């Protein structure tokens, strides 16, 4: 069983960053919680937006690390990614779920529901609850409106295949906080890393 790192090095591989983010606290304009689920994507990964090279849509993924890359999924939901690896590489980590801890009333209002477990259990839900839209794309995540705090203590991390993709479906680059009820979906026969 591996534990998340005490600090997050965004110049590292997307897999390492995705694992390190589990247990970190993410606030956007003072609203957020603990990251409990992530997915890694890299330029040589056919499921990644960066696989075919830079485009107008994905240019931020090729920029410097530690920036937000926001895209709309299926033309409906915004999704938050953190860029990693050196500029020009094209890698990122999708924030799939957080455990809501701060600003719950704001999240409930934005999401139109009260069940805490459903407020941020999925990448579109995370963005809606935290008020994240395209305007945040390209912003540094180490300055306001973002506040990212690494976990204080190591946390148990599970891994398994990513969700909702049609290519490289079996690559085990989905990471989650072991036992969290706030995941977007349970891990099937997870590997504890």
Curated annotation (Swiss-Prot):
* Keyword tags: DNA damage, DNA repair, Hydrolase
The record's Pfam families line, in alphabetical order, gives: Pur_DNA_glyco
Annotated EC: 3.2.2.-
Whether rRNA processing counts among this entry's keywords is: no
What is the uppermost EC class here?
hydrolase
Q: Which GO terms describe its biological process?
A: base-excision repair
> Which family is this protein grouped under?
Belongs to the DNA glycosylase MPG family.
Q: What is this protein called?
A: Putative 3-methyladenine DNA glycosylase
